[in-house]
């Protein structure tokens, strides 16, 4: 279980995240929602320790993540794989090598420098690409792919880290509707098929309701909603987005055909 206790991140006098507290059961698909500047990205970066908390604690299976340093911190970053809005691929390298970068914490640095990856890691990378119909692009340069294809490569890279948690920071923000669905289906697959916990920052409530079994809503750095998608009221929607409710709440879409419907969690409004 992931437990967040009073997590705060300040930049000068401004709190980007202010006293966030929640817990996440293993195997959950949690959407973190709210308008731009609500603190969603900072929250996920703190969970991975790319951003340092000013106050509070992050616990995972009893381990104090906020106290980790050195090799233990690098291991945690491998266990909590990040997926970024801008993909963070190396364009001049081929797709397979980009995916193998997810194994850096497990191999000596000289192997990656001379591109001598162990055969078992290469097989793992090809298998991960195959999960998202990208194995045929293994030898192609990453910068020759579409945005949706690049994001699927980034998800495959996260998968080869063999993580406990995937932290997806606005993974579909720059994608068209078709590629948005492909990428969200890929995230749902690693959650349902591999049992990996997913925390995904999303701006769209319709997508969040379709794919997530739980929502954490943020406004001005604070958690103001934590519960099932069906429990998101007009009042909470207005607080999250500072808009009229009918501008942000639509009819919930269905989970993609062939994938199990998520179970609803309980509701707690902070």
UniProtKB/Swiss-Prot annotation:
Keyword presence, Metal-binding: no
Top-level EC class: translocase
InterPro entries: AAA+_ATPase (IPR003593), ABC_transporter-like_ATP-bd (IPR003439), ABC_transporter-like_CS (IPR017871), ABC_transpr_PhnC (IPR012693), MetN_ABC_transporter-like (IPR050086), P-loop_NTPase (IPR027417)
Positions annotated to bind ATP: 34-41
CDD domains, per database record: ABC_PhnC_transporter
Catalyzed chemical reaction(s): phosphonate(out) + ATP + H2O = phosphonate(in) + ADP + phosphate + H(+)
Molecular functions (GO terms): ABC-type phosphonate transporter activity; ATP binding; ATP hydrolysis activity
GO cellular component, one term: plasma membrane
EC number of this enzyme: 7.3.2.2
Compartments it resides in: Cell inner membrane
Stretches assigned to the ABC transporter domain: 2-245
Membrane-topology descriptor: Peripheral membrane protein
Leader peptide range in chain numbering: none
Alphabetic keyword roster: ATP-binding, Cell inner membrane, Cell membrane, Membrane, Nucleotide-binding, Phosphonate transport, Translocase, Transport
NCBIfam families named among the record's database cross-references: ABC_phnC
Subunit structure: The complex is composed of two ATP-binding proteins (PhnC), two transmembrane proteins (PhnE) and a solute-binding protein (PhnD).
The family this protein is said to belong to: Belongs to the ABC transporter superfamily. Phosphonates importer (TC 3.A.1.9.1) family.
Function in brief: Part of the ABC transporter complex PhnCDE involved in phosphonates import. Responsible for energy coupling to the transport system.
Protein name (database record): Phosphonates import ATP-binding protein PhnC 1
Organism: Rhodopseudomonas palustris (strain ATCC BAA-98 / CGA009)
Gene: phnC1
């Amino acid at each position: 279980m992931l437990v967040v206790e009073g997590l705060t991140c300040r930049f000068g006098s401004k709190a980007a995240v202010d006293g966030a507290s929640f817990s996440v059961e293993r195997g959950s698909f949690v959407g973190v929602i709210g308008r731009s500047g609500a603190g969603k990205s900072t929250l996920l970066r703190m969970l991975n320790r790319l951003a340092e908390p000013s106050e509070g604690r992050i616990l995972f299976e009893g381990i104090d993540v906020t106290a980790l340093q050195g090799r233990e911190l690098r291991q945690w970053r491998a266990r909590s794989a990040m997926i970024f809005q801008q993909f963070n691929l190396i364009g001049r390298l081929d797709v397979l090598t980009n995916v193998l970068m997810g194994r850096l914490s497990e191999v000596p640095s000289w192997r990656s420098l001379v591109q001598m990856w162990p055969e078992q890691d290469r097989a793992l990378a090809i298998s991960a690409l195959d999960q998202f119909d990208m194995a045929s692009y293994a030898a192609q340069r990453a910068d020759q792919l579409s945005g949706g294809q690049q994001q699927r490569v980034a998800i495959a890279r996260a998968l080869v880290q063999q993580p406990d948690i995937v932290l997806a920071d606005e993974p579909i923000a720059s994608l068209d509707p078709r590629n948005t669905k492909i990428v969200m289906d890929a995230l749902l697959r690693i959650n349902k098929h591999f049992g990996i916990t997913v925390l995904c920052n999303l701006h769209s409530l319709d997508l969040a309701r379709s794919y997530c079994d739980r929502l954490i809503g943020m406004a001005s750095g604070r958690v103001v909603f934590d519960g099932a998608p069906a429990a998101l009221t007009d009042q909470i929607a207005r607080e999250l987005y500072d808009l009229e409710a009918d501008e942000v709440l639509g009819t919930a879409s269905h989970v993609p055909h062939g994938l199990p419907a998520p179970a609803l969690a309980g509701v707690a409004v902070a």
